[in-house]
Amino acid sequence: MTVKPELNEITPYLQFNRQQWGNFRKDTPLTLTESDLDKLQGQIEIVSLKEVTEIYLPLSRLLSFYVTARQTLQQATYQFLGKPEPKVPYIIGIAGSVAVGKSTTSRVLKALLSRWPDHPNVEVITTDGFLYSNAKLEKQGLMKRKGFPESYDMPSLLRVLNAIKSGQRNVRIPVYSHHYYDIVRGQYEIVDQPDIVILEGLNILQTGVRKTLQQLQVFVSDFFDFSLFVDAQAQVIQKWYIDRVLSFWRTTFKDPHSYFHYLTQMSETEVAAFAKHVWNEINKVNLMENILPYKNRAQLILEKAADHSIQKVYLRKI
C-alpha cells in the first residue's frame, strides 16, 4: 500500500495523519512489553502500546535508516583515509515546551532505537544539566528566568557536544536534580562513544545573529544529525503543566528536602493558581519567545492532541 501524504506546496513539510504515519511501520516488530513501557511513562503522560505501535515504531524505523546511512558514509570516509577514526555518534535533538512530553519521547525512542542491531548503544542527555546553579542564577538575578537561554552555561554545553561529535571517550555530563531544583555539585554521568545521543532541551533549536567571519558563532543545533519538535497548543500545554505540578504536590513535594516542599502548605486550589502564574509569567513567555519561533527548524514535528496522543506528523522534505 502506498501512503500519500497530505501535501501543501507552500510548506517544506510532508504532513501525515495518524493512520498514514502508522502504515510506515511495515513489518517492524514491537519489542516493548507493557512492563517495559511502565518504566518509560512520564508524570502525567501515559504512552500506550497503541501509541508506540502507530507513532514511535515508524519513527524508530525512519531514524534507523538515517543512522545506518550515516554510519555507511562514515565507513566510506574511513576507507578513503585508509585508517579508522573514532566512532562519531549520531545526535538527535528533541525540543519543545516545558510539560509537552520531551522526556517521555526521549525515553521511548531510546528504548526502541537500542533494539535495532546496528545501533544498540543509545544515551539520553538533557540540557538541564547545563543550567547555571541556583546560587549563580540568584546572584545574577536570573532565578525567574530559569529555562530561558541566558540561564544555561552554553559554552560548557557546546564543548560537551563538540567532544561527543569528535569521538572522545568518557565525556562528563553534569547532573541536575528536579527534586532539589538545582545542579548536583560534583556528580556527572559519563557518555562513552554511544551509537546515538538524544539531546533533550527547551531552546536547542534556537539560533541568533551570527557574528563576523572572524568570530563565527556556533549553535547547539549545528551538532544535530536530526531534530524533532514536540508540539501542542499553548492552552493545552498549560493544563498539562498545572496537572504535573499538582501531581508532584501530591507526591514528591511531600519530601521535606524537596525544593518545592513549601507548596504542600497550600491547598490544591492555591497550588493550581501558583502553577498557572508560573506558566503565564515564565514558561509561556519562554515558549513564545525562544521555543515556538524555531519549531520549523526541526526535521520532524510531532503534533499532540489534548489527550497527549500524537495526531499529526510533519516530516521535512529532503
Swiss-Prot record:
Q: What is its main location?
A: cytoplasm
| Residues given in the record as ATP binding sites | 96-103
- Origin organism is Coxiella burnetii (strain RSA 493 / Nine Mile phase I)
Pfam families given in the database record? PRK
Output one GO MF annotation: pantothenate kinase activity
Q: List the HAMAP family.
A: Pantothen_kinase_1 (MF_00215)
**Family from the record:** Belongs to the prokaryotic pantothenate kinase family.
Superkingdom of the source species: Bacteria
Pathway it belongs to? Cofactor biosynthesis; coenzyme A biosynthesis; CoA from (R)-pantothenate: step 1/5
Provide the protein name. Pantothenate kinase
